[in-house]
Amino acid sequence: MKFVKYLLILAVCCILLGAGSIYGLYRYIEPQLPDVATLKDVRLQIPMQVYSADGELIAQYGEKRRIPVTLDQIPPEMINAFIATEDSRFYEHHGIDPVGIFRAASVALFSGHASQGASTITQQLARNFFLSPERTLMRKIKEAFLAIRIEQLLNKNEILELYLNKIYLGYRAYGVGAAAQVYFGKTVDQLSLSEMAVIAGLPKAPSTFNPLYSMDRAIARRNVVLSRMLSEGYITQAQYDQARSEPIDANYHAPEIAFSAPYLSEMVRQEMYNRYGESAYEDGYRIYTTITRKVQQAAQQAVRNNVLDYDMRHGYRGPANVLWKVGETAWDSKKITDTLKALPTYGPLLPAVVTSANPQEATAALADGTSVSLHMEGMRWARPYRSDTQQGPTPRKVTDVVQTGQQIWVRQVDNYWWLAQVPEVNSALVSLNPQTGAVLALVGGFDFNQSKFNRATQALRQVGSNIKPFLYTAAMDKGLTLASMLNDVPISRWDAGAGSDWRPKNSPPQYAGPIRLRQGLGQSKNVVMVRAMRAMGVDYAAEYLQRFGFPAQNIVHTESLALGSASFTPMQVARGYAVMANGGFLIDPYFISKIENDQGGVIFEAKPKIACPECDIPVIYGNTQKSDVLENTNVEEVAVSQEQQNSAVPMPELEQANQALIAQNGTQEYAPHVINTPLAFLIKSALNTNIFGEPGWMGTGWRAARDLKRRDIGGKTGTTNSSKDAWFSGYGPGVVTSVWIGFDDHRRDLGRTTASGAIKDQISGYEGGAKSAQPAWDAYMKAVLEGVPEQPLTPPPGIVTVNIDRSTGQLASGGNSREEYFIEGTQPTQQAVHEVGTTIIDNGETHELF
């Protein structure tokens, strides 16, 4: 009895000593433990999602893929699968499970290694939220204490919901919602019992038991989970047998992107990072943009097709690679497929390998293991590329172009496969709502995988004749009218700085003598623009451009400004054209309409400053009177004083060129009124003439009339020296769009496809705005305006219509007449008399070439 008594005393002492040691250890560790109360308000790391204006997902950013689900959204079978596998006594313990610890220790003692885990679900939750993954005794002790605290703070359902949303399940999937989507492309409530068991088996070793990594191990682990569920009574024998017999159909499923707009999505990502830092990728923000699927896809298609058309005009540069030569042993299909899978795709272009070729047909293997046929029709364009200005002869048979063993690029055209190549030229498109500044579509290049440089907002390119509408607006604000006569004859003036004559020329070099300003813009006459520039003064013109939002540092103060030597981005150009389309208001482009937090609360909503030509909003600049430039007198030349030429327009502080393109919260405000509404209408009307011309002459943008078949549009071509840049910008009802095309390498020009008498069927022609950029504008605008009722140009108050003589710009006295618009008070008062001289802007050059 004494022995038993001593044994009991010893046991009590050991228990007290153990309890005291545990308490002392707890008091020592307690200051190091995190506050588990934060779990009450925990915010799981949820990726940022970017949506279109109509709610379609277009991008997702974040290292962790998580789709939060509530416990009542998770099927009971999935919950039971995790409990049976990870913590069968979950509802019985209080954070740590002594029975589980004893069982795991016994197995380890007798087997010689730890084959069973002793961590409860609550301990795993503590580790996932608060501790590092290091395997140390101190971490296990902290984990146990934290688990006890968590059980005191949260009920079992709250613990389960946090755990099932937090646990890492492989392939960047965190939580059961993300795992269901990643592996099976389903929501959790759509999973079969077998699929639930696969996911429940992953926490132990997400990489080892991953069905995308090892199907055999995934099946074995699934069967273990099903066995545990059966032994715990969660499923019947019949359910077990059926689930165990099912094959696992798992594939990687990326986020379900409805459509892609990568350049604009990247702009959103950058804006969100600038605002919120790294938390932008983790706090579950949902960003709604201003674009829609139809419009954005039309823009991307228009740009890609136009770039490919340009590239084909200039010839075939040959295969991307030669994998084996004719006569050598061909590669087997697996080696070909593996090689192709490692290559990217660029828009519609797919990598392929020619596996056979004869004069009539070639067969090419694709990355998915299928083969396609290429015929002469799909490679007739492939003249050998010699330079940007010359191509070789038209191929006559398939083997003139491709040979077996070549790695090429192909694309589908209608139901046929065509030979293709990755273009070296690039392009951008920006489309805005001119009333609000909302970005309707944005394309920053041919393909984001090819180049992430966003040419729509980052590429400063010379604008060429795209600048002329702005400069003519400045000239008309200082006294010229659409009927003013300017001398279309060559100019030659000594340039002391260059030590030679400066001789701006028309393109093509054709001259018509005195013509009206409307025709000068419509036919893009360079020398006419130079004369108007000289009439108003270079400094005045340069300062005036800032009204349209163009940054001063990119504007040159020389006469070459008249020919478009200033450099702007497509976004800046589109914004400038919006002023002419909306009645004279400088809108701020924006692309984010709304931001929601992870709970669906709106934390930002755009309140753009809108254009309102019907509102009584004064112009923020003083208007220059007509008398400052022209008196209505019959003189052959008009002299303008040097003081008048260089007088600058007072400029209030405008936005920086590279503004953050996101509208701010606040009450409704109106955009700055920078040119008066009647003046904006005049230049808008002139841009319409650039497309439709007049009897006797065509505008440079005439193709838009043919392609769109509507009269409520206007636009302007733009081409720089040596065709390094080509533009087309213009408007339609509710939309303004600018398209640029060129090479990123400023040393290269778009060139011309030079004709050769020795080569038949050679394409030849000048690569300028109308040929190189306008096709994309036309295709895009046709798609966007489909179904939009035509809206005729209606003169605003302050505009009068006068019948003028086409040859003189004076009041009509015969049949050669047209109706012309004037700001009230600027219309001509004299009848046209052809025998007497007319007021002509000629600038008094001392050297005339004819």
List each model region and its residues.
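Mid-domain, small-residue-enriched loop/turn segments at the edges of structured enzyme/sensor domains
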Residues: S500-N506, G537-R575
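Short active-site loop at a secondary-structure junction
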Residues: I67-D72, T389-T399, V422-S427, Q450-F470, ...
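Active-site SXXK
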Residues: F82-I83, M229, A299, P359, ...
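Non-catalytic, structured segments within soluble enzyme domains
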Residues: I22, R27, S111-A367, A532, ...
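N-terminal type II signal-anchor transmembrane helix
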Residues: M1-Y51, R89, A108-L109
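Conserved catalytic neighborhood of penicillin-recognizing serine enzymes
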Residues: F110-R135, K186-D189, E256-F259, Q435, ...
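Short, well-structured active-site flanking segments
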Residues: Y91-I101, Y174-G177, T236-Q239, F453, ...
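A penicillin-recognizing enzyme superfamily signal
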Residues: M78, T289, R293-Q296, Q300-A302, ...
